[in-house]
Amino acid sequence: MKHNLIYGIILAIATLTATELSAQSSEGCDLHRTRLIPYPTANEAVEHSLAKQRYMQPITEWVTDSEGLLTGEFTYPFSWVERQIFVRVEGVGVPYEVLVNGKVAGSSTNGHAAAEYNITKISREDKNSLAIRLLDSGSVAPIENFEKGDAHPVAYVLSQPRVRVRDIFYRATIGKSGIVNVDLGAIMHNQTLGTKISRLYYEVYLNDTIRLGAGHRDVSLGMHGVDTMRFGVPVPDSVLWSSESPTRLSLRLKNRIAGRDVEFYNVPLALRELSYENGTFYINGKATTMDWAEVSPNATADIVKSLYERGHRAIRFTAGYVADETLSACDELGIYVAVTAPINSSKMGTSRKRGGNPSNNPRWRAEYVERVEQMIYTTQRHPSVVAYYLADDSANGICLYEAYLAAKRISGNRPVFYEDGNGEWNSDK
């Protein structure tokens, strides 16, 4: 009933002459990343729960009003003093604003991907209100002609130290004699006015019991400095991930600043070497045929499991929002995935002239590019994701050209496709 009420409000909001966002990307967002939850202890990190804990408070229950304002509450404890506070928003489904204690933290024109906002300066000790204002979707309607499910907005309020792990990445390269070289990296961010040194401890585990590698690295960061801490771990090729053997590892991190342990992580890893050459995918050096089954982005983890049981091993999610839990299910099962940015302008025709399809209108360029980049950054740690699609049925033009170039800069070894572009250059097929 609660979700139906929220969805009803969203549909009503779309017909109102309400506050309208210009379709020119978002404001106030922190850099996009795949979901990353800090924990206060190593044991809690290993449990990897999304339940409330000292450094994270989920908001899943909302008080709604008829004007499209969803309001929740979080507590700012004393232990968060001298730390940064972020809110990660997922699954809204329409353009929205984020407000903390009545002050705007930021906004997004793309309600179909996760976004984070730094709310440190507008939060206060003790009780705080957090609101999501649903905005008129008319501004983005020309590029959102795709299936939308019920809205399930979730907000995670996160506390991180002022010298923090901003993101994590990894890459596997098959070497000689059955050894795989794993390149791990943590992007560190100093959000203080002085130079700080972080010591980052790392461990790589198989089945949470067999330690494959461990060590630590130090990095000195100047005022507001950002640097990447890299470390390598050799592992046997028997732990490589594939559809036939979806082996998963875990990366455990501990961030120590001035002798104090300030955040812990337990990040799922799945190692596979990916390449795409002359129309063929190679997984761990083996040519792999992708017999894509087109699936709604609203598919749940249970639907994915059902597809797996029916023999599907490659899924192409059409344009829209794919929940992190759904992609995690694909990781666990060994399903290859292609995700599509939330862009479909099929109702706007194919003309490239003024007033035609938005894909050739420079006014939409920033929106297209951000949606594609956001898709990549928020899914890139999922090993199941082996390809990206720019859009569905959206003609072609300058916006998709620029989106393709942006995607190629950050997609790594994953190919970028666009099948509806009449064979133009902005597709790896």
Predicted features along the sequence, with ranges:
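Accessory beta-strand-rich segments of carbohydrate-active enzymes
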Residues: 25-46, 50, 65-167, 191, ...
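Coil residues (strongly favoring Ser/Thr
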Residues: 66, 137, 208-209, 227-228, ...
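Substrate-binding/catalytic cleft of secreted carbohydrate-active enzymes
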Residues: 302, 314-429
